[in-house]
Amino acid sequence: MAELACFCYPHLENDSYRFIPFNSLAIKCMLTAKVDKKDQDKFYNSIIYGIAPPPQFKKRYNTNDNSRGMNYETPMFNKVAVLICEALNSIKVTQSDVASVLSKVVSVRHLENLVRRRENHQDVLFHSKELLLKSVLIAIGHSKEIETTATAEGGEVVFQNAAFTMWKLTYLEHSLMPILDQNFIEYKITMNEDKPISESHVKELIAELRWQYNKFAVITHGKGHYRVVKYSSVANHADRVYATFKSNNKNGNMIEFNLLDQRIIWQNWYAFTSSMKQGNTLEVCKKLLFQKMKRESNPFKGLSTDRKMDEVSQIGI
C-alpha cells in the first residue's frame, strides 16, 4: 500500500491540476536528504532531477534500511506512476480536492496488475483506453463503481460462470512489491456485472468453492468483490480491514462497507465484519473469527457440504 503522493505531484494549470510522475533519481535524492521536521509533508525539490515525494513517505520505498517498500528503481514503478497520472489527468482535480486525492492509500500490487493487463495484447484493457482509465479510477478509490470482471486487477482465471470470475493472484511474479513468501496463494472473485445475480449462478460458485477450495476462507474487504484466502492468513486480513475501516471513518471517508452475499462469505468473517460495522473494538470483533458458529441451514437444496476424502481438493495443503 502507498499514498498517491508517492507516485506523482500536482502542477497547477489555470483552475485545475495536471499530475506529473516522479523519476527514480529524484526519489533517490529525497531518500538521502536531511529535511527539517516542519517540511516533512512538503514535496521535495531535488534541484537536479526535479520534484520528489514528501519525505514523510520515505518508508514506502525499498532501501538498505527498509526492504518492505516499493522497488522504485524498476521500470514498473515508472509505468505505474504514468498510468496513475493518465487517470488523474482525465478528470478535473481542483485546489480544494488535490490534498485528499493525493493522500489516498492505494494497492501497489493492484496497480501493477493493471499495467500488466494494459500490456497484454489479448486483454480488453489493451484495446480500450476508456475502460483502462475507468479501471484505474476504481483502483485508486476515485470512482464509486465496484471492481467488476472487466475492470478487475486481473490474474489467472481459474473459474468463470455467467455471473462470477475467479482469479488466482499473481503477486509472486511482481517487480514493484512482490510477495516473497513462495507459499503465498490467494484468489479474488469479481462479479461480471454489478447487478442482481440469480440463485443458480450463486449455487454454481458455492459448489466450486466447496469442492475445489475447501482449505480456504471466502472473505471480503468491503469493496464489492470476494477474496479466497488461507485460513492461516485470516487474522492478518482482519487487522488490515479493521485498520482501513477505522481510518476511513476518522478521515471522513464514509465509504460503505459491502458485506456481500452471506451465503458465499465464510460465516465467521461475516460475523467479524458485521460486528466491526456496529462499532465494536478489534478485540471483540476478532473473537468472532475463532468462535464455533452454529451451522446455517443449507440455503440450497441438493448442495451437500459432505465430501468423501478422495473427492476433496488438495489445493492449499
Swiss-Prot record:
Gene3D superfamilies documented for this protein: Rotavirus NSP2 fragment, C-terminal domain (3.30.428.20), Rotavirus NSP2 fragment, N-terminal domain (3.90.1400.10)
Entry keyword annotation includes ATP-binding: yes
Compartment(s) of residence: Host cytoplasm
The entry's keywords: ATP-binding, Host cytoplasm, Hydrolase, Magnesium, Metal-binding, Nucleotide-binding, RNA-binding
Record: residues binding ATP: 107-109, 188, 221-223, 227
Enzyme Commission numbers on file: 3.6.4.-
GO biological process, one term: viral genome replication
InterPro entries in the cross-refs: Rota_NS35_C, Rota_NS35_N, Rotavirus_NSP2, Rotavirus_NSP2_C, Rotavirus_NSP2_N
A molecular-function term among this protein's GO annotations: ATP binding
Superkingdom of origin organism: Viruses
The keyword Cytoplasm is annotated on this UniProt entry: no
One GO CC term, this protein: host cell cytoplasm
Region listing for RNA-binding, in residue ranges: 205-241
Catalytic center residues: 225 (for ntpase and rtpase activities)
Cofactor or coenzyme needed: Mg(2+)
Role noted for this protein: Participates in replication and packaging of the viral genome. Plays a crucial role, together with NSP5, in the formation of virus factories (viroplasms), which are large inclusions in the host cytoplasm where replication intermediates are assembled and viral RNA replication takes place. Displays ssRNA binding, NTPase, RNA triphosphatase (RTPase) and ATP-independent helix-unwinding activities. The unwinding activity may prepare and organize plus-strand RNAs for packaging and replication by removing interfering secondary structures.
Classification via HAMAP family: ROTA_NSP2
Entry similarity comment: Belongs to the rotavirus NSP2 family.
Complex and partners: Homooctamer. Interacts with VP1; this interaction is weak. Interacts with NSP5; this interaction leads to up-regulation of NSP5 phosphorylation and formation of viral factories. Interacts with host DCP1A, DCP1B, DDX6, EDC4 and EIF2S1/eIF2-alpha; these interactions are probably part of the sequestration of some host SGs and PBs proteins in viral factories.
Annotated protein name in UniProt: Non-structural protein 2
